[in-house]
Amino acid sequence: MSTVNAKGAKPATDANGQSLNPEEPSEALREEYAQLSDRVREARAAYYVHDQPVISDAEYDQLYRSLEEFEALHPELKANDSPTQEVGGEVGAAFSPVKHLEKMYSLEDVFSTDELVAWLERAQKQVAELPGAPEVAWLSEVKIDGLAVNLLYRDGVLVRAATRGDGTTGEDITHNVATIKTIPQRLSGENLPEEVEVRGEVFISSKDFRTLNEAMVEEGRAPFANPRNAAAGSLRQKDPQVTARRPLSMFVHGIGYVRGVDLETQSEAYEILRGWGLPVSPYSRVLSTVAEVLEFIAEFGDKRHALLHEIDGIVVKVDDRRTQFRLGYTSRVPRWAVAYKYPPEEVNTTLVDILVNVGRTGRVTPFGLMDPVRVAGSTVEMATLHNQDMVRAKGVLIGDTVVLRKAGDVIPEIVGPVVALRDGSEREFVMPAECPSCGTPLRPAKEGDVDIRCPNAETCPSQLKERVNHAAGRGAFDIEALGEEAARALTQPVPLDAPDGTELSVPPLRNEAGLFDLTPEDLRDVMVWRDARRTVTDEETGEKVQRVTPELVPYFWTKPTKARPSVPSKTTEQMFAQLEQAKDTELWRVLVALSIRHVGPTAARSLATSLRSMDAIRQADPETLAGTDGVGPVIAQAVQEFFAEPWRRRVVEQWAAAGVRMEEEVDESTPRTLEGVTVVVTGSLEGYSRDSAKEAILKRGGKASGSVSKKTHFLVAGDNAGTKLDKAESLGVPVLDEAGFEQLLAQGPEAFGDRADAADQPAAGE
């Protein structure tokens, strides 16, 4: 899909040149829009909530722009809860939610100097139209690639710290932030405000990141992919002592809510923040002209890797705070600030080989193995090639010199070959005919699919490893001690030779059904290869030198010594304790852990809340499943296909037999006032975020729908309600304000008498 430029969207056509903008959108168009929205939401959640990006920044930017273009072409489909109207990600389940006193917005991104100049000139024009506004001065600063954090000080004392979350509600990380040495627990200086929110970015410096990763490797643990992931993962640790051991820093770059002090400009605010003892970035400057802003961007683009920390762009803000206030905000971004993103960096390297990886759903993905090369601040030696068609489209051969781009400073991408450097030794990549993990013939899931899959979902070791790793993930059973390496050891142990010459290669897990039946004794003989450092004598020089050699060691048990026998390691003990705790987890997490295709946390929550037990979900007909809020026919079909397979049913049955809870717990403390009642919430409410309003409805037995129809019983309308309010009024759906919503939650529809009865009557003309 083509991107939108500053002048507007291009008209969309299909492959035959037919218009994709009919007066009434088709069902296929609605489905396409829903899928595109879901892809953006999933990518955003992976980045902001789980700190595990699934696509590159550049891919996300393209995906996001495609959604913006779609909505520009089809405004009648645009939903109030579209990702284009939201800030950041959802609030994770691991920490308590806290509401910001003032909303934390995202920034509008531009990706070229032409786009930036257009934005600056447009902003200058808007300021010039404001009576009495001063000449525009631009505060320009580097955009730190870290995690946005909001600090709340009352009477100079730090009382709370939170992530940005969805912009309105974040995660309470106060105890973890308290371990960061550069953040003062108490402000210093004079004229301290009664209450102030200080916004900033938590990061790990480039030097500290290298040291941290060296230590991780030394301990036999996987290194972090980049400083941003390291910072975000460190800050979201459940144990603050772990956070305290990580080299986290912070620079503050703004103020949210403030009471008790007046600030005229952003640059003055920075000086005051510095005077209070807060860390302020040294990389900022107040500039007078657009030309100076462009020079600033070029300057820091040249020295970006020589800075204290990684950056992914430059932020430009109107310096005058009163002008900021008068320009205001959209629903997602301020009109007085913009983020310029540096172009992705490119280098040349050799494509040594193309291998394939088998994922959780059986998808076989080729990836390039390259000579290690440094790009965008990190060393890269692998990059995905997505599928065989993509390999052909890029025109790369094994042995080529290729252009490698670190797209968006996160995920590396092979752009294409440098054909002029070919010497005839290069060879084509051929997709294997059989699964490299289990030997099963590969095939598309259905005719016309680009992706090739291994159909042996039940016993393919690679798929099983990925499913076990997924089941243990933060969004499922949340078993921290069972990571990717442990999942591999459980499903793909190193084969051992028995005395009779046969191989002992039976894994502890043949499929995930036995996950909760494992015992420490089952894992005694599981071995893995580890690098061991040994001091040896160099044969040529006779000197003592350090050598690294592979060594076969137990993974789940300690290595035996003369003085001490082998016993389960502390991590193994933690894993079994966490497995036991996971048996009592919420039903929606169990659904996510099952790796049902298309069923992520959102759909799983809806199914669990609506149907309340695994048996009910398993026995539900397609119409019931599809009618569940946030599910639809595609997910409904995937759920039915899952339970149609006997081995998948055995997984559920064996987990249940092991004690995993398969029913939704009923909260007796909350009255079920909304049983059978469908409520739509639109616009902004003072006392509720979108998620908390939905949760309040679901907890009382109601259905929280995203769209208004003749089946809607009540519409709750806040500020900026939009088209849903118009539709509700045309259908005769009762409309409530926030006070009415709270009355509905407390007393149910009976509190509204005739208005509630009217909602069940068909609208005129039906």
UniProtKB/Swiss-Prot annotation:
UniProt keyword terms in alphabetical order: DNA damage, DNA repair, DNA replication, Ligase, Magnesium, Manganese, Metal-binding, NAD, Zinc
InterPro entries per the UniProt record, alphabetical: BRCT_dom, BRCT_dom_sf, DisA/LigA_HHH, DNA_ligase, DNA_ligase_AS, DNA_ligase_CS, DNAligase_adenylation, DNAligase_N
An annotated GO BP: DNA repair
Binding site for Zn(2+): C435, C438, C454, C460
One GO CC term on file: cytosol
Region entry Disordered, spans: 1-30, 747-766
Pfam families for this protein: BRCT (PF00533), DNA_ligase_aden (PF01653), DNA_ligase_OB (PF03120), DNA_ligase_ZBD (PF03119), HHH_2 (PF12826), Nlig-Ia (PF22745)
Residues that bind NAD(+): D57, A58, E59, Y60, D61, S106, L107, E141, R164, E201, K317, K341
Catalytic residues, chain numbering: K143 (n6-amp-lysine intermediate)
DNA damage among keywords: yes
Listed GO MF terms: DNA ligase (NAD+) activity; metal ion binding
Residue intervals passing through the bilayer: none
Function description: DNA ligase that catalyzes the formation of phosphodiester linkages between 5'-phosphoryl and 3'-hydroxyl groups in double-stranded DNA using NAD as a coenzyme and as the energy source for the reaction. It is essential for DNA replication and repair of damaged DNA.
Family of the protein in this entry: Belongs to the NAD-dependent DNA ligase family. LigA subfamily.
Protein name: DNA ligase
Organism: Kocuria rhizophila (strain ATCC 9341 / DSM 348 / NBRC 103217 / DC2201)
Lineage: Bacteria, Bacillati, Actinomycetota, Actinomycetes, Micrococcales
